[in-house]
């Protein structure tokens, strides 16, 4: 795989609280320069990203219910609508992990369905936070996502105790079939990214995108 091909797997990411306007501007410039698929940013920066990415092919991805996923469903749906109105091209929502742990699967499904409906055709990725789930819970969550028809299931927020693993990516891909799988959290070098893709990942979320496509390792990145 060429570096240009690998770049098209990457959502170039900056989600930590301290990121300022210059950081987001730099992120957008890097995404254009290296041909990344998208930038993944908090929704408050969508207008800035829209301005910086004008005329390019780089998409704007934003997060909903991030990073805990424990918001009211109505708030997630409203957040989704507002983000799309502002210019988001893709939505990454966080599943309600607490409801999964409470075995409230109907509520989990309703939560995702409400955001999916709010997307109104905009691609939706559902973050499972796999490091907090059992294998059975991962499978069940993936089955719900597949039934609803979301675009992707995604491993992690990058804000918890663990990120993507090859094992979890493979399990997710095996469960969802033709739906996309996004590996995020801890993917910081070419070798790891390629291992995730081999396991079934069709998108990589990383703040270390430049290191990934250039064959170096980014020891500073946390996502």
From Swiss-Prot:
Pfam families noted in UniProt: DeoC
Entry's EC annotation: 4.1.2.4
CDD domains: DeoC
Stretches that traverse the bilayer: none
This protein's pathway: Carbohydrate degradation; 2-deoxy-D-ribose 1-phosphate degradation; D-glyceraldehyde 3-phosphate and acetaldehyde from 2-deoxy-alpha-D-ribose 1-phosphate: step 2/2
Gene Ontology molecular function, alphabetical: deoxyribose-phosphate aldolase activity
SUPFAM superfamilies: Aldolase
HAMAP family noted in UniProt: DeoC_type1
The protein's role, per its UniProt record: Catalyzes a reversible aldol reaction between acetaldehyde and D-glyceraldehyde 3-phosphate to generate 2-deoxy-D-ribose 5-phosphate.
Protein name: Deoxyribose-phosphate aldolase
Gene, per the UniProt record: deoC
């Amino acid at each position: 795989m060429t570096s240009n091909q690998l770049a098209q797997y990457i959502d170039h990411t900056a989600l930590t609280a301290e990121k300022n306007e210059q950081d987001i501007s730099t992120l957008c410039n890097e995404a254009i320069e290296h041909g990344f698929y998208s930038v993944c940013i908090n929704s408050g920066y969508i207008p800035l990203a829209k301005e910086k990415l004008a005329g390019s092919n780089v998409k704007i991805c934003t997060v909903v219910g991030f990073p805990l996923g424990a918001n009211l469903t109505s708030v997630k749906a409203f957040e989704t609508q507002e983000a799309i109105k502002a210019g988001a091209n893709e939505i990454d929502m966080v599943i309600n992990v607490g409801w999964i742990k409470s075995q409230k699967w109907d509520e989990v499904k309703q939560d995702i369905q409400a955001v999916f409906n709010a997307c109104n055709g905009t691609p939706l990725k559902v973050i499972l936070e796999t490091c907090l789930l059992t294998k059975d819970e991962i499978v069940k969550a993936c089955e719900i996502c597949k039934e609803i028809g979301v675009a992707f299931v995604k491993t992690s927020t990058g804000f918890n105790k663990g990120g993507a693993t090859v094992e979890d990516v493979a399990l997710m891909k095996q469960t969802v079939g033709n739906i996309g799988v996004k590996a995020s959290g801890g993917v910081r070098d070419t070798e790891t990214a390629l291992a995730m893709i081999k396991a079934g990942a069709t998108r990589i979320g990383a703040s270390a995108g430049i290191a990934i496509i250039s064959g170096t390792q980014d020891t500073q990145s946390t996502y």
